[in-house]
């Protein structure tokens, strides 16, 4: 609605099934088009853990500079289970057991990307491929009593993302995220460690976890991906001939859930938290797979850490594999 300073407005209404156990920190809480393994044609195990969400929301984003944005979201959500027979989100509050909730939330976010190359006009700006850090801070307040809001809580989240060039060793992509929820809240408001039951790669998710296998109200996650480019592959004749490139990945999650939130849980989800043992996954892979100049694909071989002795499987969840193979594609020319 204004060019300088750049101000944009977004409004959305949606009524759909969503997978809330796939991503944590979002700046604009309007629609998450990647929300859920339901978009995967081929997936591991069954997925009964979808939520039925009716959402009305608005976003106001101030581009104070090209690389510093301040935003405000106002969201009204009616949250219920998509199938009460298989997935309960019941919650005990004020001597009552609730099975669906009206969540009214306000959040403010800051997005700082120093050194990013920004160009173009209109709503969708373009960004250059130069390397730069990204810092995100977000505060969310759940408000009770306004517009029928039933939940009262505060949530703080922060993330840091950057790619480092390590000379001939290649480049290292890093992503750290931390968050804390204050208040007694039901499962959909807690932070489920992001999982991916599909066989395709999805950023910032754990490939060998089922949805809601791990839940926390305080968490720390790290995702690291190192692209060796030609440092390793040039030393292996067959790999060099096929023009493949090698990579290595490591990701971890640590978190805890307060006893008050555990006591209020009436869902059929076990509140496993990676507090006594950090959960991690590691892997190696090949990228630049294709023919000629069309080389969009990569294959990752992934292993996971041992599960905690206290870990309990959720109903209808498949047994976690110790090893998996995932395929990714990144079209670019």
Language model feature labels by segment:
Residues 1-333:
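Exposed, low-structure sequence patches enriched in small/polar residues
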């Amino acid at each position: 609605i204004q060019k300088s300073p750049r101000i944009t407005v977004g409004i959305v209404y949606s009524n759909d099934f969503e997978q809330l156990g796939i991503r944590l920190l979002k700046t604009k809480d309007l629609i998450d088009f990647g929300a859920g393994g339901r978009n995967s044609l081929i997936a591991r195990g069954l997925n009964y853990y979808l939520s039925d969400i009716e959402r009305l929301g608005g976003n106001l984003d101030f581009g104070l500079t090209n690389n510093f944005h301040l935003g405000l979201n106002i969201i009204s959500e009616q949250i219920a289970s998509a199938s009460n027979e298989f997935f309960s989100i019941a919650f005990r509050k004020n001597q009552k057991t609730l099975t669906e909730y009206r969540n009214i939330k306000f959040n403010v976010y800051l997005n700082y990307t120093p050194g990013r190359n920004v160009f173009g006009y209109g709503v969708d700006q373009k960004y250059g491929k130069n390397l730069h850090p990204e810092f995100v801070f977000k505060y969310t307040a759940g408000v009770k009593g306004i517009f029928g809001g039933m939940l009262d809580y505060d949530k703080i989240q922060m993330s840091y993302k950057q790619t480092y060039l390590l000379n001939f060793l290649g480049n290292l992509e890093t992503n750290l995220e931390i968050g804390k929820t204050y208040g007694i809240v039901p499962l959909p408001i807690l932070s489920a460690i992001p999982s991916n039951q599909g066989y395709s790669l999805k950023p910032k998710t754990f490939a060998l976890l089922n949805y809601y296998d791990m839940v926390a109200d305080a968490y720390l996650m790290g995702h690291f991906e190192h692209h060796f480019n030609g440092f390793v592959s040039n030393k292996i004749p067959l790999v060099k001939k096929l023009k493949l490139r090698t990579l290595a990945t490591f990701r971890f999650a640590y978190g805890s859930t307060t006893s008050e939130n555990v006591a209020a849980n009436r869902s059929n989800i076990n509140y496993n938290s990676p507090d006594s043992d950090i959960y991690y996954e590691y892997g190696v892979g090949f990228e630049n797979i294709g023919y000629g100049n069309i080389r969009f694909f990569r294959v990752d071989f992934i292993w996971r850490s041992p599960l905690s002795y206290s870990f309990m499987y959720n109903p209808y969840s498949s047994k976690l594999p110790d090893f998996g193979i995932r395929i990714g594609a990144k079209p670019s020319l």
